[in-house]
């Protein structure tokens, strides 16, 4: 499954002597916060954060990554959030890829904290920021505080076991900050009770994030974006569950807007988050259907491959890499597909992938010389 969409980038300052690492992450608020957390706490590495829509493959994202000629790509999030097509694209070009993830955003959070601490030798304080994993406003404030205090961010929900998390992260009893909004009161109350029950020495601070019109509107806009993507993908699926879930999500979003217009910002915020969650379910279900459909149709699969490789060819061509042979192979593949000669097209596609790898590795120095360079220090989120 893929759409052609714009790339959002977050840049850190760079020095000529450092390596460049791209962090590829979905626009899921939890995973995205982790990417920005790493980008702000690392020192001698140039970190480029590239965002893709949750659950959607976009060949232009691969092209954007190529334009940085990275030494390594780290993916935050599982293959549902950041599709495996990205891994295939990058590894085919000889780019090292590592995925940090878990079965859900809570497991991904723990995996990222552990891996980043080792990989970048992060010097973190004995302080933990606890925030609900679906709380947009809470996560935003938690990120700001975690960066400022060099604290760990731990995402929680109703089933979180704080004791087990501390064991996994090898945390000593220390300073805990519970970050909450009215939307997450019950979850954070349960977390607070766990801390008081299981930790005899616990310095616990609570921060309540007020629900403002601005925060409610931001949640509505995020939900609208997720729903738009879900609708586009749903047009290509016959899964009966998709339509029902979409209907519920649309109703929740409309109710969120009504609540917002009535000044009920907490209610609007909660409904918007619920609508976004359902939109992501639709994106996942539709994506699964579309992938199955493509795998069963040789022509469709080849055309999809062409879109992927053409984006890579064009960005290398723009950056001054010699892609003459690759362009010739691409035109031969198009002709073979038009003639219905799919066997020949598949054979040529293998050659084209090999040629692209050769082009990238040979032209990497050229690309690196023209790589995007940030012009100022990125502001704290």
Segments from the language model and where they lie:
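Intrinsically disordered, low-complexity segments enriched in Gly and acidic/Ser/Thr residues
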Residues: 292-331, 335
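Extracellular glycan-binding segments that recognize GlcNAc-based cell-wall polysaccharides
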Residues: 14-236, 240-255, 259-292, 296
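Sec-dependent N-terminal signal peptides of Gram-positive bacterial secreted proteins and lipoproteins
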Residues: 1-13
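Regular secondary-structure segments
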Residues: 246, 250-261, 327-338, 346
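Membrane-interacting alpha-helical segments
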Residues: 223-238, 299-316, 370
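C-terminal amphipathic alpha-helix
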Residues: 265-298, 329-381
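Amphipathic alpha-helix face/heptad-repeat signature
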Residues: 219, 245, 271, 298, ...
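Charged, low-complexity interaction regions
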Residues: 234-242, 260-268, 315-324, 338-346
């Amino acid at each position: 499954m893929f759409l052609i969409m714009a790339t959002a980038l977050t840049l850190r300052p760079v020095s000529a002597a450092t390596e460049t690492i791209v962090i590829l992450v979905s626009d899921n608020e939890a995973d995205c916060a982790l990417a920005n957390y790493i980008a702000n706490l690392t020192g001698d590495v140039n970190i480029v954060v590239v965002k893709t829509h949750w659950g959607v493959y976009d060949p232009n994202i691969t092209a954007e990554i190529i334009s940085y000629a990275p030494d390594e790509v780290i993916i935050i999030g599982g293959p549902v959030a950041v599709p495996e097509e990205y891994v295939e694209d990058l590894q085919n070009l000889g780019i090292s890829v590592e995925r940090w993830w878990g079965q859900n955003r809570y497991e991904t959070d723990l995996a990222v904290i552990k891996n980043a601490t080792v990989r970048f030798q992060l010097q973190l304080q004995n302080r933990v920021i606890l925030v609900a994993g679906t709380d947009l406003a809470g996560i935003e404030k938690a990120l700001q505080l975690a960066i400022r205090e060099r604290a760990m961010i731990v995402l929680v929900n109703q089933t979180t076991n704080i004791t087990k998390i501390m064991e996994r992260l090898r945390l000593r009893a220390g300073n805990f900050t519970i970050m909450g909004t009215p939307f997450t009161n019950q979850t954070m109350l349960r977390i607070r009770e766990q801390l008081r029950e299981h930790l005899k020495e616990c310095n616990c601070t609570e921060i309540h994030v007020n629900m403002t019109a601005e925060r409610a509107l931001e949640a509505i806009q995020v939900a609208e974006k997720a729903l738009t993507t879900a609708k586009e993908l749903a047009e290509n699926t016959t899964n009966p569950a998709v339509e029902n879930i979409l209907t519920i999500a649309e109703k929740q979003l409309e109710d969120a807007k009504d609540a917002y217009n009535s000044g009920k910002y907490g209610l609007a915020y909660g409904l918007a988050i619920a609508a976004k969650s359902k939109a992501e379910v639709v994106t996942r279900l539709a994506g699964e259907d579309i992938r199955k459909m493509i795998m069963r149709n040789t022509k469709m699969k080849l055309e999809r491959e062409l879109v992927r490789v053409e984006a890579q060819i064009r960005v290398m061509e723009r950056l001054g890499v010699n892609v003459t042979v690759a362009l010739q192979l691409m035109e031969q593949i198009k002709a073979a597909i038009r003639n219905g000669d799919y066997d020949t097209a598949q054979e040529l596609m293998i050659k084209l992938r090999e040629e692209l790898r050769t082009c990238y590795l040979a032209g990497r120095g050229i690309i690196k010389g023209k790589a995007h360079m940030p012009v100022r220090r990125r502001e704290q989120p």
